[in-house]
Amino acid sequence: MNVEHHTFSIAGRCARTGAFGVAVSTALPAVGSAVPWVGPDGAIATQATTNTSLGREGLRRLADGVPIAEALAALLRDDPFSNRRQIHGVDRAGAWAHTGPDCKPWCGHRVESGFTVAGNFLTGPDVLAAMATAFVADESAELGERLLRALEAGQAAGGDQRGRQSAALLVWSPEVRPHHNLRVDDHADPVVELRRIFTVMHGFLETLREDYGEGLGIYRRPKL
């Protein structure tokens, strides 16, 4: 599937817990259905002229032990529209990003230790700088919280120059939590709404813990 997702996003990992995640927002509906791809071996965001198979196949290659730089670069070599793709992500050992020369300006990415940020059709580079600063500000916080703070900072710095409509947070963690898979598909202020839902689900988890310990195993990852 190819859809134009002019957007800003962050992919990150938590060295403390082994979690991976992506947070993203755009001025189109249902961004969470296409851009974020997350699993036990890494996190990938595929955007601009979005090809969802890049995310799906990228995770499969990470599961096979292929480093993320090698996995994503190989997929783009076989992609006739790589000049219009923006893709970035992290695995357990590294991080990698690609912004095609035909992505809508302002566009760009940053590859940092343990995370990547990228965007296209943005108000400017300050969006990514703000996201990076917010993500590293408190490394003791859980990954979902850090990703959401980065998304909020990117929106506050200008975000998508066309406006705003949807947002999503997707996290893989050894400890499954109800606030790890959240989508706002159509809203006037999606990042604010994503924060509201995140807070609600945090409260729901605490209620389960108070009443049932770990919630009767509802959010326990099965041992395979």
Residues covered by each model-derived region:
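N-terminal nucleophile
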Residues: M1-L224
